C-alpha cells in the first residue's frame, strides 16, 4: 500500500472547540474508524489520567485490526503510563523549531536531541514499537530535522511524524522538505498537517507524492483551530488521483460510517 492512514480524531480531533467525548463515545468511535480501513488509531494521551487513560486502555483491549497508538511527551513516566494501557505504538513527541524549543520548553537543540534519544531508548528497551513526532517541523531548521531523523533511525525508530503544527505550509514547499528528508534518511515519513490556510488535503497529498507513507487525518477534518486533514476527502483524493483504494469496500459504506461517527460527535454537517 502506498499510503497508510493514521486517524487522530480521538487525540487531535477532540481538541475542536465544543467537543467532549465520554469513554464509551471514544470506544464506539474507535470501533467504527477501524472498520474504515485505517492503519492506526491515535487513541489519546494516557498521561492525562482519569477517563483519558481508561478510554485508551479500553480501546487497546478491543483487539481491533487497526494499530492503537498513544501520544507521549519526552517523559519516561508518560511512556510507562502508555505501556500500562497496552497500546501497540508509543508515540514520543517533541517541539523541534527554535521558537517552540525556547518558548515551550525553555531549552535548546542539544537538550531536545539528548532527551529524545534518552526516551526513545527507554521505550525501545521496554520492547515498544516507537514512532517519533517532530512538533512544529514546518518552522524548524531543516538540517536539524534531518539530524534528528538520522539519530532516531540509527536507534531503531522506523517512522517519524513531520508536523505542520501551525498550518503554514503550502504544497510545493512541503513536497521539497519531505523529499529532502527522504533523500537523506531512509525513515518512513508520517505527515501531520493543519488546515489554517485550507490546504490540509493538498499538503497531505503533496507529502505523499514526495514519499510520505503515512498521513494523519480526522473525521470531517475536525481538530484544533481550523482542523486537520479530512479523512473521507483525503481517501477520495487518493482513490481518484492514484487509483489506490484505502477502503476496499463500497465508498457509500464509508460515508455511512462517517455519519455514524458524526452522530456520536453530535455534529450536524
UniProtKB/Swiss-Prot annotation:
<protein>
    <recommendedName>
        <fullName>Homocitrate synthase subunit alpha</fullName>
        <ecNumber>2.3.3.14</ecNumber>
    </recommendedName>
</protein>
<dbReference type="Pfam" id="PF00682">
    <property type="entry name" value="HMGL-like"/>
</dbReference>
<dbReference type="InterPro" id="IPR000891">
    <property type="entry name" value="PYR_CT"/>
</dbReference>
<dbReference type="InterPro" id="IPR002034">
    <property type="entry name" value="AIPM/Hcit_synth_CS"/>
</dbReference>
<dbReference type="GO" id="GO:0009399">
    <property type="term" value="P:nitrogen fixation"/>
</dbReference>
<dbReference type="InterPro" id="IPR013785">
    <property type="entry name" value="Aldolase_TIM"/>
</dbReference>
<comment type="similarity">
    <text>Belongs to the alpha-IPM synthase/homocitrate synthase family.</text>
</comment>
<comment type="function">
    <text>This protein is a Fe-Mo-cofactor biosynthetic component.</text>
</comment>
<keyword id="KW-0808">Transferase</keyword>
<dbReference type="GO" id="GO:0009058">
    <property type="term" value="P:biosynthetic process"/>
</dbReference>
<dbReference type="GO" id="GO:0004410">
    <property type="term" value="F:homocitrate synthase activity"/>
</dbReference>
<feature type="domain" description="Pyruvate carboxyltransferase">
    <location>
        <begin position="3"/>
        <end position="255"/>
    </location>
</feature>
<keyword id="KW-0535">Nitrogen fixation</keyword>
<dbReference type="GO" id="GO:0019752">
    <property type="term" value="P:carboxylic acid metabolic process"/>
</dbReference>
<comment type="subunit">
    <text>Heterodimer of an alpha and an omega chain.</text>
</comment>
